[in-house]
């Protein structure tokens, strides 16, 4: 489907492999995707989106899903990353790429090296969906620090969120 049709459709496409594991997590996955739909009704999608903006978008969606359906239904792109791995390994690499623009430049940071290589992009030394995991914890940090609720944060520009969490990176 070309970009113009996608913009007119304003939807989200997903593939689900039906089995006991995926079906039990379907409500949380749908909540995650619905959060994206809500956000992009208020924040215009741009093809030159920064890594920071994408991480906030994914972090908002996963925090919303966890708030609705519990931590036990957190996506494996977050739950499989330990805090030690996040702090010692992932955050320092991602911090260097926060303001890169465009999916071709941010794919490895967001999805990890394996997917980047598969798509023909350069690897940066990150595991599967490292940017999703970091985005989840970045937004969680923001919500806890500010006391803001997920609904109002979902429609807030990424720059405003980033401006309040500079200490997340130290």
Residue ranges and their predicted role:
Residues 24-25, 29, 51-55, 125-133:
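Short, conserved micro-motifs enriched in small and acidic residues
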Residues 19-23, 27, 31, 66-74, ...:
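Secondary-structure boundary elements
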Residues 41-51, 71-80, 145-152:
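Inter-helical turn/loop segments and adjacent helix faces that build the functional surface
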Residues 20-34, 86-110:
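An acidic intrinsically disordered interaction segment
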Residues 1-23:
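Active-site scaffold of zinc-dependent metalloenzymes
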Residues 51-98, 166-169:
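Post-HExxH zinc-binding segment in Zn-dependent metallohydrolases
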Residues 95-170:
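Pan-zinc metallopeptidase signature
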Residues 28-41, 58, 62:
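Active-site recognition of the HExxH zinc-binding catalytic motif
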């Amino acid at each position: 489907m070309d970009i113009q049709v996608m913009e007119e459709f304003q939807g989200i496409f997903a593939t689900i492999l039906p089995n006991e594991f995926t079906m039990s997590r379907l409500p949380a996955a749908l909540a995650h995707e619905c959060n994206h739909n809500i956000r992009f009704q208020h924040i215009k999608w741009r093809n030159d989106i920064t890594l920071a903006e994408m991480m906030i978008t994914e972090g908002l969606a996963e925090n919303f899903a966890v708030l609705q359906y519990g931590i036990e239904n957190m996506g494996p792109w977050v739950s499989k990353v330990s805090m030690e791995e996040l702090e010692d390994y992932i955050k320092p690499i991602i911090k260097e790429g926060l303001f890169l623009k465009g999916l071709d430049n941010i794919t490895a940071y967001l999805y990890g090296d394996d997917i980047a290589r598969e798509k023909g992009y350069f690897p940066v030394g990150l595991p599967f969906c490292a940017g999703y995991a970091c985005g989840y914890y970045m937004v969680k940090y923001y919500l806890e620090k500010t006391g803001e609720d997920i609904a109002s944060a979902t429609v807030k520009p990424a720059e405003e969120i980033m401006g309040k969490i500079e200490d997340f990176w130290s």
